[in-house]
Amino acid sequence: MKLNKIEIKNFKCFENESIILHPKLNILMGNNGTGKTSLLEAFRILIGSLYLAFDKYKEKIEMPGIVKDDIRLKTVSKSLEPQIPTNVSANAVVDEVFLPTPEQPYQLFDNNEITWLRSMETFGGKTTTRDAKEMFAVSKKIQEAVRNGDEVNIPLVAYFSTDRYKKERRDTDISKAGSRMRGYFNALDTTTNTKFFLDLYYTETLDEIQNNVAS
């Protein structure tokens, strides 16, 4: 899956912004306070929509949403007022194996493209998912493929916030026979979980040695 374009409205410091992405590599450059981290947080919400239909494992696979601190503030008559709705939307190319089937009740774009939008329409309200039906269908396809044991490549997701180096998340519960979806545990969390990674690596390596099968 590759993101082609994102659009954000009333998100953090951005009133209305549209960004076209390079298919290979994208680098954000700018002075402090120009919105680089804000853009990454918008990406985090959009990519998190991939989790819409995933099985939830003790809140380790969490779908981030728009929060009150994400809403752009504007000076109006000498006061700061939140500007809503706050929207983040994206267009992406999806591997054909994960595309929704033709009988789905919505229209796919051409060239294996999907689009989705997340929004906060009232201050402090919930982040909407009604305009993310295409991504929900892709998410469902991925979960079904994993559940059925299909040999398919699924998207790699990793988010590294500027706070990860100083915030350590403490939880365990890594089992040898865990789901393949463990690879998504805490992937979009703003904290670091070194122990989780080491435990996961240990159990997968041990299983590979003992059973002589690729992990």
Pin down the residues of each PLM region:
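P-loop NTPase switch/coupling surface
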Residues: 1-202, 214
